[in-house]
Swiss-Prot record:
Protein's name in the database: Biosynthetic peptidoglycan transglycosylase
Catalytic activity: [GlcNAc-(1->4)-Mur2Ac(oyl-L-Ala-gamma-D-Glu-L-Lys-D-Ala-D-Ala)](n)-di-trans,octa-cis-undecaprenyl diphosphate + beta-D-GlcNAc-(1->4)-Mur2Ac(oyl-L-Ala-gamma-D-Glu-L-Lys-D-Ala-D-Ala)-di-trans,octa-cis-undecaprenyl diphosphate = [GlcNAc-(1->4)-Mur2Ac(oyl-L-Ala-gamma-D-Glu-L-Lys-D-Ala-D-Ala)](n+1)-di-trans,octa-cis-undecaprenyl diphosphate + di-trans,octa-cis-undecaprenyl diphosphate + H(+)
Keywords, comma-separated and alphabetical: Cell inner membrane, Cell membrane, Cell shape, Cell wall biogenesis/degradation, Glycosyltransferase, Membrane, Peptidoglycan synthesis, Transferase, Transmembrane, Transmembrane helix
Membrane topology: Single-pass membrane protein
């Protein structure tokens, strides 16, 4: 009995050590990942991102098309993007972007209630900064784990970058259709003009597309797009643009 008891204690101690070791490895890997994100964001204070997680995933799929296709993306400076588009996106996606801290608590709570009622994730209540966090580093998968990581990256973005820089990166990286990324590519793809020349109505229609850009690309001129664009156009005058610091 004594020998059996000793063996049991040895096994228990061994299991505890293994759990501590595994936990330490997991924690170390998690911290290393967060540090990687933070360093990347710090570099983007003065270096433009070459691509995003969404772009890289799309590029892989497009390369397997027949015939192979490529990502459409061209970075342009903030002041070369129409103020109409900036106002339309803020009016549509995040009315308090210029003054919030990257989170809209009311929208998050509303999304939580909606998801609970549906039994699965259908809404995220994401601000512009949260959308950027997801586009830069994460996947299109909808899960609470991914949402948690999105919130952490959002805090990093808001802490390290000013609002205008966040918006500049967002404008240059958001998806506007399969393989179409950024304001310049979208303006040329849909209207054959540079982003600097986008008018109010064109900008409002582009803003409507963001929740489901691929669907709207395939269903151009839908009645809903026109109706929603009219609502956004009316709100654009009140949209507050961020100021550089």
């Amino acid at each position: 009995m004594v020998a059996a008891s000793g063996t049991q204690r040895t096994r228990t101690v061994g299991l505890a050590r293994w759990i501590v070791y595994a936990g330490s490895v997991f924690a170390g890997a998690w911290l290393a990942t967060q540090l990687f994100y933070l360093v990347q964001i710090a570099l983007w204070s003065f270096i433009n991102p070459g691509s995003t997680a969404f772009m890289r995933t799309d590029a892989w799929w497009l390369s397997h098309d027949k015939p192979p296709a490529q990502i459409q993306h061209q970075w342009v400076p903030y002041d070369q993007i129409s103020r109409n588009l900036k106002r339309a996106l803020i009016a549509s996606e995040d009315a308090t972007f210029a003054t919030n801290n990257g989170y809209d608590v009311d929208a998050i709570l509303q999304a939580w209630e909606k998801n609970k009622a549906r039994g699965h994730i259908v809404a995220g209540g994401s601000t512009i900064t949260q959308q950027l966090a997801r586009n830069l580093f994460l996947s299109r998968e909808k899960s609470y784990i991914r949402k948690g990581q999105e919130l952490i990256i959002t805090w990093m973005l808001e802490t390290v970058l000013d609002k205008e820089r966040i918006f500049e990166i967002y404008l240059n990286s958001v998806e506007w259709g399969r393989g179409v990324y950024g304001a310049e590519a979208a303006a040329r793809y849909y209207y054959r003009i540079p982003a600097s020349r986008l008018g109010a109505w064109q900008s409002a229609r582009l803003a409507v597309m963001l929740p489901k850009p691929r669907w709207f690309d395939a269903h151009r001129g839908s009645a809903y797009q026109a109706q929603r664009a009219a609502v956004i156009a009316r709100r654009m005058g009140a949209a507050e643009l961020p100021q550089s610091q």
